[in-house]
Amino acid sequence: MARTKQTARKSTGGKAPRKQLATKAARKSAPASGGVKKPHRYRPGTVALREIRRYQKSTELLIRRAPFQRLVREIAQDFKTDLRFQSSAVMALQEACEAYLVGLFEDTNLCAIHAKRVTIMPKDIQLARRIRGERA
C-alpha cells in the first residue's frame, strides 16, 4: 500500500491523547535496553529479627576464639607475666563471658522497653548493672 500525505482534520471533541512525561518514557525504555536490575533489599528490621531468631536457636560461641584469647592474655599480663593457659581454661572463660554478656543485654533490653524505647542505649546498660548491684 502506498503512503499518502495526511491532512489535518477538525476534532470532534473527544479526549486528546496525553503526552507521556519524559521520565516515564525513560523509565519504561531503560529495562528494555538491558538495564541493570537493582538488588533486592529487605525492609528495615526484617534481617534483624531473622538474626535474633537464628542466634537464639544456636549454641555456638559468638566471639572469635583468637581475639578473645589475646584479650585474656593481655589482661593476665597485669597480674603475672609468662602465664600459660590450657585451651579448656580459655574456653571456660569464653563461655562465662558470653553468658554474662547475653544476660546483661537481656536486662538492658528490658530497661529500654521500660523507657518505652526499642533501641538500647548506654544508660540502659548502666541501669541494668546498677540494679544488679555490680556498679554503684
Swiss-Prot record:
CDD domains: HFD_H3 (cd22911). Its main location: nucleus. It is found in: Nucleus; Chromosome. The modification N6-methyllysine is found at K5, K28, K37, K80. The modification N6-acetyllysine is found at K5, K10, K15, K24. InterPro entries: Histone-fold (IPR009072), Histone_H2A/H2B/H3 (IPR007125), Histone_H3/CENP-A (IPR000164). Core component of nucleosome. Nucleosomes wrap and compact DNA into chromatin, limiting DNA accessibility to the cellular machineries which require DNA as a template. Histones thereby play a central role in transcription regulation, DNA repair, DNA replication and chromosomal stability. DNA accessibility is regulated via a complex set of post-translational modifications of histones, also called histone code, and nucleosome remodeling. This is Histone H3.
